[in-house]
């Protein structure tokens, strides 16, 4: 069996630019065949042609708007039906950074559709197939804003908080099986998402923006290390342990039938 057949096919959403494009490059370099998904067919084919020429791997493209129900269903069916697929990178995402009152209903709906609905449905399609074969890896791209909210990130942070909770739950579901689930939580990263967010990357403090290539390389290193949660820019791994431990303690402390004493003061 060839190395490429062993590695299988990797699906990357949002593959025409940014982190997705770099993921496609790195996975092709490792020997994966690819199924690349993004809205613009011309950009997708340009990326695919470059990867075929550079690495000699098989690269398929599927132009789809994951905010559109019909397109999402097509991609979900493709992921579920192809037994060669061993890896899904759920990277596609949208960001509008503005107070809720200054965000249009269309912008709000688009973030919900792509960041939550599409990610959840594609995760469902992939994990159902992976669990049936007891093999496969799901990578969901979240954000550090999934556990920290700014005055301009209420909607975006809310969608990424879903990614955090949803993916952590999936990790519990597949524990002890041959299926792996990784949650990647980048901080500010130099990608074209900033052009649409309403906040130019140049407005961020110097030294706080990671290059996209470094972010993906760190995320893949975390995957190789077997990390459940990868924060590419956080040096002190104990911070993550403290955060997850505190969350577990808070949940444990809530498991009582009685109100907290501070709510029982008499008038």
What do the predicted segments below correspond to?
Residues 143:
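Residue(s) in the substrate-gating loop at a strand-loop-helix junction
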Residues 30-46:
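Conserved glycine-rich Rossmann-like NAD(P)H-binding loop of the short-chain dehydrogenase/reductase
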Residues 91-96:
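Conserved NAD(P)H cofactor-binding loop of Rossmann-fold oxidoreductase domains
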Residues 16-17:
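Conserved glycine-rich cofactor-binding loop
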Residues 99-100, 107-112:
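Substrate-binding pocket helix/loop in short-chain dehydrogenase/reductase
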Residues 123, 159:
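Active-site helix of classical SDR
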Residues 183, 199-239:
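C-terminal helical subdomain
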């Amino acid at each position: 069996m060839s190395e490429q057949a062993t590695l299988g096919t990797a699906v990357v959403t949002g593959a025409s630019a940014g982190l997705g494009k770099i993921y496609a490059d790195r996975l092709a370099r490792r020997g994966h065949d690819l199924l690349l998904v993004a809205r613009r067919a011309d950009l997708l084919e340009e990326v695919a042609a470059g990867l075929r020429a550079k690495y000699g791997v098989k690269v398929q493209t599927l132009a789809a708007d994951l905010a559109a129900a019909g397109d999402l269903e097509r991609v979900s069916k493709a992921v579920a039906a192809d037994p060669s697929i061993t890896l899904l990178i759920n990277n596609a995402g949208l960001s509008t950074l503005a107070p809720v009152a200054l965000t249009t209903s269309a912008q709000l709906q688009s973030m919900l559709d792509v960041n939550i609905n599409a990610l959840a449905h594609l995760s469902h399609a992939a994990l159902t197939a992976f669990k049936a074969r007891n093999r496969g890896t799901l990578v969901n791209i979240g954000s550090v804003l999934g556990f920290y909210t700014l005055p301009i990130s209420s909607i975006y942070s809310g969608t990424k908080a879903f990614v955090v909770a949803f993916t952590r739950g999936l990790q519990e579901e597949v524990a002890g099986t041959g299926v792996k689930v990784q949650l990647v939580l980048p901080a500010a990263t130099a990608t074209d998402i900033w052009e649409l967010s309403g906040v130019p990357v140049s407005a961020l403090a110097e030294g706080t923006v990671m290059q996209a290539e470094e972010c993906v390389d760190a995320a893949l290193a975390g995957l190789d290390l077997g990390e459940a949660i990868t924060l590419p820019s956080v040096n002190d791994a104990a911070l993550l342990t403290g955060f997850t431990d505190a969350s577990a303690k808070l949940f444990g402390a809530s498991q009582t039938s009685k109100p907290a004493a501070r709510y029982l003061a008499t008038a």
